[in-house]
Amino acid sequence: MSKILVFGHQNPDSDAIGSSMAYAYLKRQLGVDAQAVALGNPNEETAFVLDYFGIQAPPVVKSAQAEGAKQVILTDHNEFQQSIADIREVEVVEVVDHHRVANFETANPLYMRLEPVGSASSIVYRLYKENGVAIPKEIAGVMLSGLISDTLLLKSPTTHASDPAVAEDLAKIAGVDLQEYGLAMLKAGTNLASKTAAQLVDIDAKTFELNGSQVRVAQVNTVDINEVLERQNEIEEAIKASQAANGYSDFVLMITDILNSNSEILALGNNTDKVEAAFNFTLKNNHAFLAGAVSRKKQVVPQLTESFNG
């Protein structure tokens, strides 16, 4: 039997890479020929994680079949438009995810582990425990990092009641102080000055099909929202170029202040009225403040979905 590829979503974040690496290792311990790969290069936050724990980044692939794989395992996503290019030509045998289920179907039954927790890594941690497999230090490190990243160090409303205990245990195994390491890791991902506008709007971006519209929702983390808004003109040009190249009807950019847990929403496209209705605000110069919003999954996408379907 050929190897099974394990990967997270396009534009991978720390949880996409961490959960796929950790789950591939677990599957190998259980006798499955599984290999972690990625659908893009690590961002600066994830690069910090991999360097800290001395781990090589998983190879970047564009096609599962080109790697000789007929079967794949998805972590941290399930929607096909967020997955590998030839997802419909291979068999999805497992999914480990903590997002909504949409635009997903398979020809055969499969194992799906879906939980409304803070990260896919939280679920993989439980799978280690359930299978009685010891977690190596570096694997604990990448899972912890995925949880920290997705919950902004357990401050996001996506944080599940079980996540703090998971984080504490993983931090102990990884040999790090949760708060000290977590803050250093998050800050590593806020260095946006070296990024072009095109890179900035694609660092952490996902496409959602909302009532027939292809809506791109991107997020950048920062410690200074105004520093990002100073580049608004070039950011808007990059957004328009991305829309033209990919057919997005709308583009929503979350500029998230990780220290104060707020976001500025920058929106362009055909349905900005629906964006305004979703958050009950008025866009001025294409952007508006959204107090307390840090989670795309819980505080932006559901609201947009309801508004676009309304």
UniProtKB/Swiss-Prot annotation:
Ligand binding (Mn(2+) 1): H9, D13, D76
Main location: cytoplasm
Keywords from the named record: Cytoplasm, Hydrolase, Manganese, Metal-binding
Catalytic activity of the protein: diphosphate + H2O = 2 phosphate + H(+)
One Pfam family it belongs to: DHHA2
InterPro entries, per database record: DDH_dom, DHH_sf, DHHA2, DHHA2_dom_sf, Mn-dep_inorganic_PyrPase, Oligoribo/pAp-PDE_c-di-AMP_PDE
Transmembrane stretches, start-end: none
Gene Ontology CC entries for this record: cytoplasm
Gene Ontology molecular functions: inorganic diphosphate phosphatase activity; manganese ion binding
Reported cofactor(s): Mn(2+)
Keyword Metal-binding: yes
SMART domains cross-referenced by the UniProt entry: DHHA2 (SM01131)
Residues that hold Mn(2+) 2 according to the record: D15, D76, H98, D150
Cofactor comment text: Binds 2 manganese ions per subunit.
Quaternary structure and interacting proteins, as annotated: Homodimer.
Family that this chain belongs to: Belongs to the PPase class C family.
PANTHER family: BIFUNCTIONAL OLIGORIBONUCLEASE AND PAP PHOSPHATASE NRNA (PTHR47618:SF1)
Protein name: Probable manganese-dependent inorganic pyrophosphatase
Originating organism: Streptococcus mutans serotype c (strain ATCC 700610 / UA159)
Gene that this polypeptide is encoded by: ppaC
